[in-house]
A protein has these predicted regions:
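Type IV pilin-like appendage domain
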Residues: 76-128, 134-153
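Long, low-complexity, intrinsically disordered polar/charged segments
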Residues: 40-48, 99
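Terminal low-complexity, poorly structured segments
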Residues: 8-10, 59, 99
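N-terminal single-pass transmembrane signal-anchor helix
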Residues: 2, 7-43
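Hydrophobic/basic alpha-helical segments enriched in Actinobacteria
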Residues: 20-21, 43, 66, 76-78, ...
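Membrane-proximal N-terminal amphipathic helix
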Residues: 45-76
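Hydrophobic aliphatic residue packing
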Residues: 23, 27-34, 70, 79, ...
Length: 153
């Protein structure tokens, strides 16, 4: 008959264990809460950044659209940015077509003056439109020759 070796204390503890201790569950819960908090903070920053990038691209695209409409319809067009607002209007000078455009949530656009394109699509001056939110700011620029560019951080 073989003799059984006595088990050491730690082996006996492991053999009788049916689940996790309260301390182990609490440690895992704390680690998960910290990880979710960090992920949420990064997600908020990411969404703010994407809203800013989308809003800046939208402003540049709408400026190009107003310029192209001015050329195709042989009529001056204006783009008016309301002071620190998330809305702006594209209008045909002297009436006619009017479009109100809304920027993404928490994004505002400001310009020092009304952007005007002649009937040939030429800007009346060089313009810079600043687009901003809690993450930072970007800009859409119309140069004196009619080129339109935008920059985001």
């Amino acid at each position: 008959m073989k003799r059984r070796r006595p088990r050491s204390d730690w082996r006996r503890l492991l053999a009788r264990r049916d689940g996790f201790s309260l301390l182990e569950v609490l440690i895992v819960a704390v680690i998960m809460v910290v990880a979710m908090t960090l992920a949420f903070a990064r997600w908020q920053g990411y969404t703010a950044q994407q809203r800013l990038r989308f809003g800046t691209a939208q402003v540049a695209t709408d400026l190009r659209q107003a310029q192209e409409r001015a050329k195709s319809e042989r009529a001056p067009y204006t783009v008016t940015f309301l002071a620190s607002s998330s809305a702006y209007t594209i209008a045909r000078a002297g009436g006619g077509f009017l479009e109100n455009t809304q920027l993404p949530d928490q994004v505002t656009a400001t310009a020092s003056q009304v952007v005007t394109f002649s009937a040939f699509g030429r800007p009346a001056a060089a313009y810079t439109v600043t687009v901003q939110n809690s993450w930072g700011s970007g800009s859409a620029t119309v140069n004196a020759t009619g080129g339109i560019t935008y920059q985001t951080p």
